[in-house]
């Protein structure tokens, strides 16, 4: 079991923990709104992604393979939404006496997982590799493989959302003035836009 689960967990930690749309937005939210107000956002990432894994395991992967246009549409929709979120981050502002924006809600965060290009590809890749019970002696059925995947991604996603939100909260100790806050939000928005460009470059293979 260890020989199967540890490589799976490592893969999930790497995929979940590396910079991407969710982690960039969580860092910005941690900085602008603090830990408590970012909890719904964090919970939405974890639960939304787990629900995506379950939906994909029920047959959506085969639909993507049969009808690639669906994946393309989701890719475009996700990219447009990410650009909107980058604009939203850019216009965020918070200080002790002023607030012009609201953190991402649980529902928004959960639904975003279904159009998050990085997340969808993570899920498809992991399910395709680690549910092949012909390649792994330890698992006997597709369901067993999915159980291990769900456990691994729960651990890795909880670790990732807590870590990246903590980074944002930590940065709040140094970014206090209105000018520095605007600079930070602008930088995070640019990172999100660059992520959109990179994801689409990878997707279309240009």
Model region roles, listed by residue range:
Residues 3, 104, 114-118:
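Juxtamembrane cytosolic amphipathic helices that cap and anchor the N-termini
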Residues 20, 34, 116-117, 177:
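Short loop-to-helix capping motifs
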Residues 2-72, 125-149, 153-154:
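Juxtamembrane transmembrane-helix termini in multi-pass membrane transport proteins
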Residues 109, 113-126:
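Selected transmembrane alpha-helices and immediately adjacent juxtamembrane segments
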Residues 65-94, 154-167, 172-206:
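Selective transmembrane alpha-helices of multi-pass membrane proteins
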């Amino acid at each position: 079991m260890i020989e199967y689960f540890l490589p799976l967990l490592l893969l999930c930690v790497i995929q979940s923990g590396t910079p991407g749309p969710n982690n960039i937005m969580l860092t910005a939210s941690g900085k602008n709104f603090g830990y408590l107000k970012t909890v719904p956002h964090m919970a939405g990432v974890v639960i939304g992604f787990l629900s995506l894994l379950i939906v994909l395991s029920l047959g959506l992967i085969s639909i993507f393979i049969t009808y690639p246009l669906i994946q393309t549409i989701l890719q475009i929709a996700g990219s447009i939404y990410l650009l909107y979120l980058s604009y939203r981050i850019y216009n965020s502002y918070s200080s002790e006496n002023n607030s012009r924006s609201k953190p991402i809600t649980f529902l928004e965060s959960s639904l975003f997982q279904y159009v998050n290009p990085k997340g969808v590809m993570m899920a498809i890749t992991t399910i395709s590799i680690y549910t092949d019970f012909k390649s792994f002696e330890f698992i006997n059925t597709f369901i067993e493989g999915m159980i291990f995947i769900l456990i691994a991604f729960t651990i890795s996603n909880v670790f990732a959302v807590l870590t990246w939100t903590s980074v944002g909260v930590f940065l709040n100790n140094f970014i206090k003035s209105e000018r520095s806050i605007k600079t930070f939000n602008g930088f995070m928005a640019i990172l999100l836009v660059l992520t959109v460009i990179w994801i689409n470059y990878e997707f279309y293979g240009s």
